[in-house]
Swiss-Prot record:
Homodimer. One of its GO terms (cellular component) is cytosol. One of its GO terms (molecular function) is ATP binding. Binds 1 zinc ion per subunit. Keywords: Aminoacyl-tRNA synthetase, ATP-binding, Cytoplasm, Ligase, Metal-binding, Nucleotide-binding, Protein biosynthesis, RNA-binding, tRNA-binding, Zinc. This is Threonine--tRNA ligase. Its cofactor is Zn(2+).
């Protein structure tokens, strides 16, 4: 007898072993038809996996987040089924679930085209209509190897070789197609009807550019058509907001092959950059940070002592001169310790907060570069706090509060916080990691805010809290971090004199709020579709004449606005005023001032907004107050976005 406890506390008894599907059938045929998988004592299992002992069971349906993820994972297998039917010579690699969808990496001698993707999607739909069952078989290792050898699936064999301790594997049979997976998967293809293949890209085996190139096909899948339609609309909107397109249209920046991963900032884009830097400089000054500047090229001996040379060398640009090896700094932290080490510090000097707008370079793979979002040369709003163990919790708590306030200024209110713990490749003792992880967890707990763990995702020198923003399209961007690091100060001989007049190694907190200026500007561009809040707009005001007679008056107004600290330009072209207004609206300039004879005579301006609102006639002084009020609101007042 097997006793099954359901979420409502009721108990059902079964003679002998049972399955999630049988439990669902005992409740009702409707639930059984909707069953995708189940949770047995908290663990996800396939609908037909045997339950051999008393257990707590939850039925998973497409209405559950887990159910949608299972549908997506099964769609990846369905994609494999379709691809192998159409192109038998290709070799399947991996097909995981990702945010909002899935992908499959495939090795093919022939490059895939959009026509190939359309054919694959069509075949997937045909297979779904066959309404076949997906069969799971736990298969001994030797038999699994034989199956994939016979099918010529070299990459599956390599994956098996990576798991020497596994004596058996789960094989999922989609008719004649077989794939290897831990599961769970849907019991039948009828659950996979709501999907769409979305794009293709290149990838490398094991993510290493030295290995063979693969072709990656992306897709999305949902529980119902309405969710799919909403997602497709969101993707289309994201394409309109692509920061590379908007950056070109608004003359913000460009990239070119002669400097891969490096940004050529134009005047408009550099203005946004400078506004961010000036804002962050004041934030840091107001919160007790001292700003420093350190070298960009440093001898390898420092990077060896810090641990970067052994743990991060492949991502560092190096050079040599006069028989010495140097690295262009990928991070600022070792250099900040050098500043701390100049002069003996007392416990009375702590916490010591050092900030730098540090220019860093990392040798990212060329295939991963993506506009401002993934670059090789970037600037961080970087800072390091040297403190005692007893000061960690308060410093982290203060940083959390500061970070959330900064994000609110940029219009981001939906913030996700996660604690990334020790990775396999790391420096320092387990005891130091235990202490550091607990310090961050305690600070998060005491903040009263929701947070989650990210196991194994910490930096090699310490755990960290990651702050992720959810933008206006619901996308999540990881930006800020704070990391507890007891290791680097010790490696680089940092010390202070404690209250007992003894030498002690300080704790080092690595922290950034924006992350990199480049990436954060890219996020802002896409979040606002280029319609920046007034305080961030490259040009806040354009002054336009109706005829040549008002040209001088326009220039006088521009000068008055500039003296008040506003970013203003004039448009004195001999064009119709309607044409000029339309053009400057497309340039996303927040305010347009029109001067005709009446305005010149009265010393006033006619004010229009980029949203098309006519604010009427007012004095220049009144207009300046209007703009200063909008600037003070920062990103708390979201601009109306017009995609026309």
């Amino acid at each position: 007898m097997v006793a099954i406890t359901l979420p409502d506390g009721s108990v059902k008894n079964f003679e002998g072993n049972t399955t999630v599907m049988e439990v669902a059938q005992s409740i009702g045929t409707g639930l059984a038809k909707a069953t995708v998988a189940g949770r047995v004592d908290g663990h996800l299992v396939d609908a037909h996996d045997p339950i051999v002992a008393d257990a707590k069971v939850e039925i998973v349906t497409p209405r559950d987040d887990d159910g949608v993820d299972i549908i997506r994972h099964s769609c990846a297998h369905l994609l494999g089924h379709a691809v192998k039917q159409l192109y038998p010579d290709v070799k399947m690699v991996i097909g995981p679930v990702i945010d909002d969808g899935f992908y499959y990496d495939i090795y093919s001698e022939t490059p895939f085209t959009p026509e190939h993707m359309a054919a694959i999607e069509k075949r997937m739909m045909e297979l779904i209509k066959q309404d076949y069952d997906v069969i799971k078989k736990i298969t001994p290792r030797a038999e699994v190897i034989k199956i994939f050898e016979e099918r010529g699936e070299d990459y599956k064999l390599k994956l098996i070789n990576d798991m020497p301790g596994e004596e058996a594997f789960g094989l999922y049979h989609h008719q004649e197609y077989v794939d290897m997976c831990r599961g769970p998967h849907v019991p039948n293809t009828r659950f996979l009807k709501v999907f769409k293949l979305t794009k293709m890209s290149g990838a490398y085996w094991r993510g290493d550019a030295k290995n063979e190139q693969l072709q990656r096909i992306y897709g999305t899948a949902w529980a119902d058509k309405k969710d799919l339609k909403t997602y497709i609309q969101r993707i289309e909107e994201a394409e309109k907001r692509d920061h590379r397109k908007i950056g070109k249209a608004l003359n913000l920046f460009h990239m070119q092959e002669q400097a891969p991963g490096m940004v050529f900032w134009h005047a408009n884009g550099w203005t946004i950059y400078q506004v961010l830097e000036q804002y962050m400089r004041k934030v840091q000054q107001d919160n007790g940070y001292e700003e420093i500047k350190t070298p960009q090229i440093v001898d390898r001996s420092l990077w060896e002592r810090s641990g970067h040379w052994g743990n991060y060398a492949t991502n560092m640009f190096t050079t040599s001169s006069e028989k010495r090896d140097y690295a262009v700094k990928p991070m600022n932290c070792p250099c900040h310790v050098q500043v701390f080490n100049q002069g003996l510090k007392s416990y009375r000097d702590l916490p010591l907060r050092m900030a730098e707008f540090g220019s860093c370079h990392r040798n990212e793979p060329s295939g991963s570069l993506h506009g401002l979002m993934r670059v090789r040369g970037f600037t961080q709003d970087d800072a390091h706090i040297f403190c005692t163990q007893s000061q960690i919790q308060q410093e982290v708590a203060d940083f959390i509060k500061l970070t959330l306030a900064v994000y609110e200024d940029f219009g981001f209110n939906n913030i996700i916080m996660k604690l990334s713990t020790r990775p396999e490749k790391r420096v320092g003792s387990d005891e130091s990691w235990d202490f550091a992880e607990k310090a961050l967890a305690d600070a998060l707990d005491n903040s009263g805010l929701d947070w989650a763990y990210l196991p194994g995702e910490g930096a090699f020198y310490g755990p960290k809290i990651e702050f992720s923003l959810k933008d206006s399209l619901g996308r999540v961007w990881q930006c800020g971090t704070i990391q507890v690091d007891p290791n680097m100060p010790e490696r680089l001989d940092a010390e202070f004199v404690n209250e007992q007049n003894e030498r002690e190694v300080p704790i080092m907190l690595h922290r950034a709020i924006l992350g990199s200026f480049e990436r954060f500007i890219g996020i802002l561009i896409e979040n606002y579709a280029g319609w920046m809040p007034v305080w961030l707009a490259p040009q806040q005001v354009v002054v336009m004449n109706i005829t040549d007679k008002q040209a001088e008056a326009c220039e006088n107004v521009v000068n008055e606005l500039k003296k008040s600290g506003l970013r203003a330009i004039s448009d004195l072209r001999n064009e119709k005023i309607g044409f000029k207004i339309r053009e400057k609206t497309l340039e996303r300039i927040p305010y347009m001032l029109v001067l005709g004879d009446k305005e010149v005579e009265s010393g006033s301006v006619n004010v229009r907004t980029r949203e098309g609102e006519n604010l009427g006639v007012m004095s220049v002084a009144e207009f300046i107050i209007l703009v200063e009020t909008a600037v003070a609101e920062k990103g708390r007042q979201t601009p109306k976005i017009d995609q026309e």
